[in-house]
Swiss-Prot record:
Name of the featured protein: Argininosuccinate synthase
Gene3D superfamilies per record: Argininosuccinate synthetase, chain A, domain 2 (3.90.1260.10), HUPs (3.40.50.620), Single helix bin (1.20.5.470)
Binding residue positions for L-citrulline: 90, 125, 129, 178, 187, 263, 275
Organism: Legionella pneumophila (strain Corby)
Record-level GO BP terms: argininosuccinate metabolic process; L-arginine biosynthetic process; urea cycle
Amino acid sequence: MKKVIKKIALAYSGGLDTSIMIPWLKEHYEHAEVIAVICDLGQQEDLDTIKNKALKSGASKAYVVDVKNEFAIQYLWPLVKSGALYEDQYILGTISRPLIAQKLVEIALTEQVNAVAHGATGKGNDQVRFEYSIKALAPQLEIIAPWRTWDIKSRQEAIVYAKAHGIEVPVTPKAPYSRDHNIWYISHEGGVLEDPSQEMPDDVLLMTAPVSQTPDEEEVVVLDFKKGVPVALNGQELSPVDLLNSLNQKAGQHGIGVADIVENRLVGMKIRGIYEAPAAAVLYKAHKLLESLCLTRSTLHLKQSLQQTYANLVYEGRWFSQTKQALDAFIDVTQQHVTGCVKLKLFKGNIIPAGMHSPYSLHHPELATFEEDNVYNQKDAEGFINLFSLSAKIYSQVHQEGNYD
């Protein structure tokens, strides 16, 4: 017997993909009540307007949940500590998806709904991220993914459907960019961007100045970290949200943090995306520099070898997994002494190191100097080299003599 859906909680953004969800759900699930869940991730949109749009579209209720601080502390700071970049380029702004799913589930359980819905397409990664998280947190909930079942097959058709139902969306056929925005990044996809052979148009960037329009003077920023987490900017302790907003503004005006990449989606296809993440680029650079000062060689190398694994977990939406918890435990140990101050210069799209120090620095000038010293006995190196190269020496001797097993 088919389960009757009476109440649906919808992850709602007010954009094209979710703007047409409410009328469609009400049409296809007879008498179903739709509750919109809107997460404030710092997307700098008028959320009251979005809430009213949801209600005007037929939602019985619309929740606006401010998750900016939680997003920074519980998601972005662990990401900074990990140093993870998907395919060595992507700054992983979609790390917000598990948090959105978590809030969707919390409200769904409070409202006692029997289904949740999202606006992710059947060709993208977000459907996996949302549904993995929902199944991990509340496996009893039914999941509705309209993009996989309805007759709408393109963004142009979605625009037509929206207009037919009197829904205003910030997209036109002439500039059909699909954008995602939070305090960590802005992504741009679709339209002319789908062709990697085409240069990025001037109208794409929203947070970052083109390099040709950046100041002709460098700007110095100083970042303080405590156990791998940024705590102050230019000597001033700031909340995570204020730090990110301030750094986005400073780095953005210098053209920093733009990535034009072709990535491998989880579902098997390649997609081109433009990503703006000024603050993220600066924080990653500063954190990496501080780690080079504070971590031992073997710890740093092991951590670097696990960064792609961590990036894959985030990219695939496996935030609520045992593997991710285990990696977090390792990373937290590595960050115990990643405390200190990093000075950087921002200029014409470049992040230039300008000095750093830490009370836990493992750099000893008396050991590293090229001048005469009384600490390092260079004669000790000969014995080390003999032992270090012993296996290579034996291998060469055996094969030169033709003594094969």
